[in-house]
């Protein structure tokens, strides 16, 4: 299993089985038949052990959207051979974005914000007051429906609303608070 061709095939099988959910890649016996049938020294137990070790590292890296340099350091600290480390690093460089997108799509179940636009306008009158001359922000949110159970997958919703100065300040404070929390979690 120290040949790049075979180890890369194992990683490709892992990608198809675990992330792409390929029906042809259901069991490790299939991997043994497809790739390692000519190698008598490679047992199903060895394939399973190596597969699980690779999957553990890739899963950890994918869920934390690990940078390539961090991934390389983790692989270097593991007990993989040099050839296997090179294959894993190459695999992650090539498939990082693809795996992240697959995980992202499978974990989203609500609408997503596709576009936000805004402008400042002057409110001149209302029902109660004939002349106001007060600045307001007009916000427009375009949402994309990502619910896979719905037949209208491409349906987009448009939400428009006005905010006065106080509402805008509150919203900005909340956004800043969210940003601080996200930054604290990413460190």
Curated annotation (Swiss-Prot):
Cross-referenced InterPro entries: COMM, COMMD1_N, Murr1
One GO molecular-function entry: copper ion binding
Transmembrane segments: none
Pfam family, one: COMM_domain
One Gene Ontology cellular component annotation held by this UniProt entry: endosome
GO BP annotations listed: copper ion homeostasis; negative regulation of protein localization to cell surface; negative regulation of sodium ion transmembrane transport; positive regulation of protein ubiquitination; regulation of proteasomal ubiquitin-dependent protein catabolic process
Domain COMM: 112-186
Function: Scaffold protein in the commander complex that is essential for endosomal recycling of transmembrane cargos; the commander complex is composed of the CCC subcomplex and the retriever subcomplex.
Subunit structure of this chain's protein: Component of the commander complex consisting of the CCC subcomplex and the retriever subcomplex.
Annotated family: Belongs to the COMM domain-containing protein 1 family.
Protein name per the record: COMM domain-containing protein 1
The organism of origin for this protein: Dictyostelium discoideum (Social amoeba)
């Amino acid at each position: 299993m120290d040949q790049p061709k075979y180890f890369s095939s194992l990683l490709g099988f892992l990608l198809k089985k675990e992330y792409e959910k390929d029906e042809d890649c259901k069991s490790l016996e299939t991997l043994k038949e497809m790739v390692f049938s000519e190698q008598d020294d490679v047992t199903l137990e060895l394939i399973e052990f190596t597969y699980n070790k690779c999957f553990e590292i890739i899963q950890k890296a994918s869920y934390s959207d690990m940078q390539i340099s961090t991934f390389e350091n983790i692989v270097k600290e593991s007990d993989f051979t040099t050839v296997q480390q090179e294959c894993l690093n190459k695999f992650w460089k090539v498939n990082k974005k693809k795996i992240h997108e697959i995980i992202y799509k499978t974990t989203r179940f609500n609408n997503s914000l596709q576009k936000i636009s805004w402008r400042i306008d002057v409110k001149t009158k209302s029902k109660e007051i004939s002349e106001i001359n007060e600045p307001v922000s007009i916000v427009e949110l375009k949402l994309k429906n990502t619910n896979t159970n719905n037949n209208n997958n491409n349906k987009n919703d448009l939400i428009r609303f006005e905010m006065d100065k106080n509402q805008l300040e509150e919203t900005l404070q909340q956004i800043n608070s969210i940003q601080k929390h996200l930054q604290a979690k990413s460190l």
